[in-house]
Curated annotation (Swiss-Prot):
Description of how the protein assembles with itself and partners: Associates with the 50S ribosomal subunit.
Coiled coil: none
Record-annotated EngA-type G domain positions: 2-164, 197-368
Name of the featured protein: GTPase Der
Cysteines engaged in disulfide bonds, as pairs: none
Every KH-like domain range: 369-453
Family membership noted in the UniProt record: Belongs to the TRAFAC class TrmE-Era-EngA-EngB-Septin-like GTPase superfamily. EngA (Der) GTPase family.
PROSITE patterns in UniProt: G_ENGA (PS51712)
Signal peptide from the UniProt entry: none
């Protein structure tokens, strides 16, 4: 699949054009310069031709962080097929604009100069100042008013070759993703074994989420910096490891509520959306610092989506605490995540990272498993005999049988005579019995007491 990359200085409208071409809001857009710091990718169709659209980080020489972004952007451009260089039509062309453009021209790829924010006759006159760039393909557009986009799309389609697929590792995954059934229907364990594993990396700012992503995929595509809050857009990496395909998403770092500005508030909402579409969450904690109330809140956000969960103690090489001591504190403070395994790593030092993949696979297997109905009912029957369900106002409360009605996580219906009378403490008792008898480490269990004939709604954990 051929690749199109959007390149330009911060705040020229690359993310807005990306969203327009992708026909959905994927990249965060804002008037704040430098909103996009990492690359976003989306498979799109232009005039009936499939291609991969890449929204690069803004190119700017004014900070150390953006020098890192520039290096990554130019490397990404070198591996693309078409370059769209965007400039701000409300600003006169600068020497920096020309320097970046000529550097891209050296790659000998089809390149178009796209002048955005042409919203008036005055803007059209100013656009003539860009004619001395010496490029034939110049497009005047206004993404906000949706003008000029059709002409640009037609030019892109003309550059795309028919039936050309590059032998790029990432493209091997596209056919796989196309065949993936994500309609929310109940799937068999066999289908789960074939599909890719979606892993969201969450935590407060500067705990090392981007470093962990880089260590996991052995590639430094996510921007890493000591500046708190470096990642704003969620960063996706699709990666194959020992025959399994993983999609890692490095979500935006979550700050204290009072410090969340508009752009980061939207990023927080995006984080929740990412988790909603994930299978497993890696909750990253900074083991070199005391646990905070914000760590607990973030854990609660991740927990509400009923994902597989792994707690990652990062920066372990800088920690002065004993592992067992910190684990005890986590289990005391995060009681609702008592089922989550805990692992210590050093992302920057790449220590113990290799132990994460087997752990992710183990949790995913538990997350998607189908429990044999006969064994499930044996465990429930033994549990109720050992500790009968308390009576309600003198009337007996019975479980007739149990049946699994969903996966990811395991969802189990308890068919009863009085489902509303099953106390939450007894449900917790049953969940503990299930954990003792089945491999359910790292996953929540949803128990849904129901009457005969009742639909699988109002699930309770």
């Amino acid at each position: 699949m051929q690749k199109i990359i959007l390149v330009g200085k911060p705040n020229v409208g690359k993310s807005s054009l990306f969203n327009r071409l992708a026909r959905q809001r994927i990249a965060i857009t804002s008037e704040i310069s430098g909103t996009t710091r990492d690359t976003n990718k989306a498979k799109i169709e232009v005039e009936g031709k499939d291609c991969l659209l890449i929204d690069s980080g803004g190119l700017d020489e004014s900070s150390e962080l953006f020098k890192n972004v520039k290096f990554k952007t130019l490397a990404e451009a070198k591996n693309s097929d078409i370059i769209i260089y965007m400039v701000d039509g409300k600003m006169a062309p600068s020497d920096e604009d020309r320097a970046i453009f000529y550097e891209l021209c050296k790659l000998n790829l089809p390149i178009a100069l796209v002048i955005n924010k042409i919203d008036s006759k005055k803007d059209e006159q100013r656009a003539w100042e860009f004619i001395n760039f010496g490029v034939k393909e110049i497009f005047e557009i206004s993404v906000s008013h949706n003008t000029g986009i059709d002409e640009l799309s037609q030019w892109i389609a003309g550059q795309l070759e028919d039936d050309v697929i590059k032998t790029d590792e990432s493209e091997d995954f596209d056919d796989f993703l196309e065949n993936f059934n994500d309609e929310g229907e109940l799937e068999s364990s066999e289908n789960f074994e074939d599909r890719y594993i979606r892993v969201g990396i969450v935590g407060r700012v500067n705990v090392g989420k981007s470093s962990l992503l880089n260590a996991l995929v052995k590639d430094a595509r996510a921007v890493v910096s000591d500046i708190a809050g470096t990642t704003i857009d969620p960063v996706n990496e699709i990666y194959e490891h020992e025959g399994r395909i993983f999609e890692f998403v490095d979500t935006a770092g979550i700050r204290k509520r009072g410090k969340i500005e508009g752009i980061e508030r939207y990023a927080l909402n995006r984080t929740e959306k990412i988790l909603e579409n994930s299978d497993i969450a890696l909750l990253v904690l900074d083991s070199s610092e005391p646990l905070t109330e914000l760590d607990e809140r973030i854990a609660g956000v991740a927990n509400k989506f009923n994902l597989g969960m792994i707690i990652v103690l990062n920066k372990w090489d800088k920690s002065e605490r004993e592992f067992d001591e910190l684990v005890k504190e986590i289990k005391d403070r995060f009681k609702f995540l008592s089922y989550a395994p805990i692992i210590s790593v050093s992302a920057l030092g790449k220590k113990r990272i290799h132990k994460l993949y087997p752990l992710i696979l183990e949790v995913y297997k538990n997350f998607t498993q189908k429990i044999q109905t006969s064994k499930l009912n044996e465990v429930i029957e033994e549990a109720t005999k050992a500790h009968p369900i308390p009576r309600e106002k003198g009337k007996s409360v019975k479980i007739y049988y149990a049946a699994q009605f969903g996966f990811a996580p395991p969802k189990i219906a308890l068919i009863m005579n009085r489902p509303k009378c099953l106390h939450f403490s007894y449900k917790r008792y049953l969940i503990n019995k299930l954990r003792q008898n089945f491999e359910l480490s790292g996953v929540p269990i949803v128990l849904a007491p129901k009457k005969r004939g009742e639909s699988d709604e109002n699930e309770e954990q």
